[in-house]
Amino acid sequence: MSANQDITLTEGEGSRPAGDKGKGKAVGSEDIPMEQYSGDSETEESDAADDETFPEDDIEEEEEAGDDNLERISEENIIPGGRRTRGKVINFAEAAEKVEADDAMDDDDDEEYKQRDEDDEMQG
């Protein structure tokens, strides 16, 4: 828009007070008193929600149906020799002692720690 053009305001534009930013109530809206609302609308909504089916319900039903069709596992699929540890023999008693020793070392570190005060940081 150039400075030479005239700007026309329609009725109502520009007639607002300077402090009014248009955030008031909408024109023509009416407040409805609470007495006019009936309590039945809430129960109708909750009844309607109970009648709806949700996809999660269908999934659970399919999983339950799938559990009934379990077949026996073939022993040919079981790996012999306990290769879950890739052949390494684990001494669980020794591993437990090692874990306890590591925990004891951590406790020593906690006892030596002294928290610095904020006042010490500002003075030093």
From Swiss-Prot:
- Name where it's found: Nucleus
UniProt keywords, alphabetically: Chaperone, Nucleus
**Annotated spans, Disordered:** 1-124
InterPro entries, sorted: Histone_chaperone_domain_CHZ
- Its main subcellular localisation, reduced to a broad class, is nucleus
Q: Which domain of life is it from?
A: Eukaryota
One GO term of the cellular component aspect? Answer: nucleus
Keyword flag Iron? no
User: Which stretches are tagged as biased composition: Acidic residues?
Assistant: 41-68, 102-124
The family line of this record is: Belongs to the CHZ1 family.
On assembly, the entry states:
Forms a heterotrimer with H2A.Z-H2B, stabilizing the association of the histone dimer. Also, with a lower affinity, forms a heterotrimer with H2A-H2B.
Tell me the function of this protein. Answer: Forms a chaperone-bound H2A.Z-H2B complex that acts as a source for SWR1 complex-dependent H2A to H2A.Z histone replacement in chromatin.
Q: Report what the protein is called.
A: Histone H2A.Z-specific chaperone CHZ1
Which species does the entry assign this protein to? Coccidioides immitis (strain RS)
Q: Which gene encodes it?
A: CHZ1
